[in-house]
Design a protein with these regions (language model features):
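Residue-level hotspots at or immediately adjacent to binding/recognition sites across diverse folds
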Residues: 26-141
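Bacterial signal peptide processing site
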Residues: 18-21
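Sec-dependent signal peptide recognition
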Residues: 2-10
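C-terminal motif of bacterial Sec signal peptides marking the signal peptidase cleavage site
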Residues: 14-16
Length: 141
C-alpha cells in the first residue's frame, strides 16, 4: 500500500508541476511564482544596486547593493548601501543616512515614517526618517 501511495504521489507531483508551468506563463514567457501578484526582489548585479519587478530590472542610482524592499501606497522603498554609507531609496531617489561604514539591512514604512535597520562602524542602529538612533554602546553589541 505504501509503495502504491508513493507512486501515485510522485506521478501527481510530476504531472502537476508540468501543468502549472504551462498554465502560469505570462505574455513575456515568464513563469510567475505567485500568479496575479506583483513580485518585488531587491539585490544587485554587475551594474550596482537594483530591484526587479516581475523580472524587470529597475536601477537604484548610486547604490552598491540593495538589501530589502517594501511597497507602501504605490511607492517602492529599498534599503542598501552606497560606498561607505547606509542609504535608502524612495522609488529611485536615494537618501544617504548618517554614520560611516554602514549598511541599511531592512526597511519598514509606518504612515509617513520610514525606518531603516542596520549598522555602522560603531555598532547596530536604526534610522527613523534619516535620524540615526544607536542601539549599542560598542562594536560587539
Amino acid at each position: 500500500m505504501n509503495k502504491f501511495l508513493f507512486h501515485i504521489s510522485l506521478a501527481l507531483l510530476f504531472f502537476g508541476c508540468d501543468l502549472l508551468e504551462t498554465q502560469n506563463t505570462n505574455e513575456n514567457g515568464n513563469n510567475p511564482i505567485i500568479p496575479n501578484h506583483t513580485i518585488y526582489i531587491a539585490g544587485n548585479d554587475e551594474q550596482g544596486a537594483c530591484y526587479w519587478i516581475n523580472g524587470t530590472r529597475i536601477e537604484l542610482p548610486g547604490g552598491d547593493w540593495a538589501t530589502d524592499i517594501v511597497v507602501s501606497n504605490g511607492n517602492v522603498y529599498t534599503s542598501g548601501t552606497c560606498g561607505e554609507h547606509a542609504c535608502y531609496w524612495i522609488n529611485q531617489e536615494r537618501f544617504d543616512l548618517p554614520g560611516t561604514w554602514g549598511e541599511g539591512e531592512a526597511i519598514a514604512v509606518d504612515g509617513d515614517d520610514v525606518y531603516v535597520a542596520g549598522w555602522f562602524d560603531n555598532g547596530s542602529c536604526y534610522w527613523k526618517n534619516g535620524s540615526k538612533i544607536n542601539l549599542t554602546t560598542n562594536r560587539d553589541s
